[in-house]
Amino acid sequence: DFFRYLNYKIEWKDSLIGIKGPKGCGKTTMLLQHIKETFLGNDLDKVLYISLDNLYFASHDILDVVEAHYNNGGTHIFIDEIHYYEKWQTLLKNISDDFPGLNIVYTGSSMLQIQAGEGDLSRRQAMYEMRGLSFREFLQFEQGIKQDAVELEDLLHNHIGIAMNICSQTAILPLFKRYLKYGYYPFYKDVHNGIDIRLQAVVNQIIENDYAKIDDVNISTIRKTKKMLMVLSERVPQQPNMSSLYRELETDRNQGLKMLYALQRGGLLLLLGDNVKSSDNLSRPDKIYVNNPTLMYALSPYAEIGTVRETFFFNQLSEAHECRYPKA
């Protein structure tokens, strides 16, 4: 079976675990795999998996469900789509306080909402972030080729040997082209040729649902944010003329930067600047990218291959490194 990289990094014995990341990156699948591998058999009655996007919780109190599970010997609870619960942070505190010994794992599809409230839980929880498939994971997912993660230092000094080792196992270039086109999101195997439509639905949900909830933005801002994403997707990577962009969107600098960084936190854009902490101050980025090549192709089917490769490199490197834009 194929397991995501994050599955092996999580300390599953911790009492409170949060997993955040963009919609479609595979968080739910990872939870269900862990439950199957860990509890299948005599211990299955000790674990409860619930998803808060289920309509059941529109008229039922989740704390009643947790209490019933706990009183019947439950030791673990997995809460998916936590951001659908309006006061999710209070909910997690109450569960943690009221049910001692209960192990809690929760996920949120929107990085926006998880980030907005994680400060008060920071002392209690272990927080992890999941991203889309790396090319290394894609090779294993697609053809069963297992390759250890390559450190940047090793890549810089031994790239020829690393490349020869991988190329000896398969014809790598056709696979790389397929990865760039549709391989970043694990659900590509389920949708076949409909990945563009699926990704457009993901984008709409992030902007219309997640962004609207966290910042309580109105319909006009949602429309402008969608337009911003589409305008930028046709021009990236670029050193943006933000004043011109704001005029085109009929917005001001303050709102424009809020929309821009919301798109970044939602996993739709990558922003590159000379200061890695610039997002705290909402400063103008030096360069803007669509988050990953697969999303780039979905938003702009005729993306230039050099731009696609540059986006791939930035996306992969930023997983474990701070990327900065060099100043002259």
Predicted regions and their residues:
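Hydrophobic anchor at the beta1->P-loop junction of P-loop NTPases
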Residues: 19
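Short glycine-rich substrate-engagement loop in P-loop NTPases that contacts/grips substrate
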Residues: 44-73
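Accessory nucleic acid-recognition modules appended to NTPase machines
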Residues: 189-328
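Pre-Walker A adenine-sensing motif
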Residues: 1-12
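Walker A (P-loop) phosphate-binding loop of P-loop NTPases
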Residues: 23-24
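Interdomain motor-coupling "hinge/lid" segment immediately C-terminal to the ATP-binding subdomain
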Residues: 117-229, 233
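Conserved lysine of the Walker
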Residues: 27-28
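Structural recognition of the conserved hydrophobic beta-strand(s) that form the central parallel beta-sheet
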Residues: 78, 103-109, 129
